[in-house]
């Protein structure tokens, strides 16, 4: 399964469209994950979208869905913008939540800095800010194994 992961589009829908077109040109996108700060941006696109999973960020006013756990191809994924897990101070709290929820990956944002690390068997992935042309592609194997690539336009 191939998943495009992005966040912090901040109304730069042109960049979102470019990211999606570039990713789709490399192969089918099975799902799209948006991690907040641009919650409604995907609705502004004129292109057909794969299934979308998203959470709200600190700039998405009047939204309370700031955390979600989904299962794709047998892998449990924690989705969060990260501001309530204090990711600007590190990923320990995020990792703890992912472990408690038996997640193979925790996808987060808020810092606008791309980062990928694996700790205690959990992939911690920050795709970077889509408004700056940064995103990630997640690969989920048939056994639920999760790998990722950080990308930039």
Segments predicted by a language model, with ranges:
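Short amphipathic alpha-helical segments
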Residues: 17-18, 44-47, 66-67, 91-92, ...
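N-terminal active-site segment of His-dependent metallophosphoesterases
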Residues: 1-49
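Binuclear metal-dependent phosphoesterase catalytic core
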Residues: 18, 22, 71-73, 99-102, ...
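Active-site environment of divalent metal-dependent phosphoester hydrolases
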Residues: 10-14, 39-43, 59-64, 85-89, ...
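Mid-chain, well-packed structural core segment of small domains
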Residues: 73-108, 113
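Helix-adjacent hinge/juxtasegments
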Residues: 47-87
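Active-site neighborhood of phospho(di)ester-bond hydrolases with catalytic His/Asp-centered motifs
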Residues: 5-7, 31-37, 53-58, 78-81, ...
């Amino acid at each position: 399964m191939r998943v495009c992961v992005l966040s912090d589009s901040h109304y730069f829908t042109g960049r979102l469209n470019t990211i999606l077109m570039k990713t789709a040109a490399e192969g089918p996108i099975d799902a799209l994950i948006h991690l907040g700060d641009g919650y409604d941006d995907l609705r502004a696109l004129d292109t057909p979208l794969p299934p979308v999973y998203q959470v709200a960020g600190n700039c998405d006013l009047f939204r309370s869905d700031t955390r979600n756990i989904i299962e794709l191809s047998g892998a449990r994924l924690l989705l969060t913008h990260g501001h309530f897990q204090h990711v600007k101070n590190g990923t320990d709290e995020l990792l703890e939540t992912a472990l408690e929820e038996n997640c193979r990956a925790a996808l987060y944002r808020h810092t606008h800095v791309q980062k990928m690390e694996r700790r205690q068997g959990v992939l911690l992935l920050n795709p970077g800010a889509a408004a700056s042309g940064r995103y990630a592609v997640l690969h989920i194997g048939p056994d639920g194994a999760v790998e990722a690539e950080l990308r930039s336009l």
